[in-house]
């Protein structure tokens, strides 16, 4: 069994769904989807006298955002990064209470949140 901890508002999690499902299919094993509440850090802005730590956080956040957009484009997805700020707690609660194979629920909800909004 593959155990995957996910948060519907996480773009990284959304981009990982297809590979996880493909791996599970290739290995003929089920996926146990576990809700996980992540916190989205705001994209830091450059300030006049920023410290080395502030510079590091800003550059890293910008790099993460560009990398996510790159992988989304490779998969032909048009992603609005602001969707990561929307609260998905209710959906995580539903997931926690589902029994059996919840892969279709997870896949549909991620698509609805990130693509069809």
Which role fits each region the language model picked out?
Residues 1-20:
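Local sequence-structure signature of Cys/Sec-based thiol-disulfide redox active-site neighborhoods
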Residues 17-113:
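Structural alpha/beta surface segment adjacent to cysteine/selenocysteine redox centers
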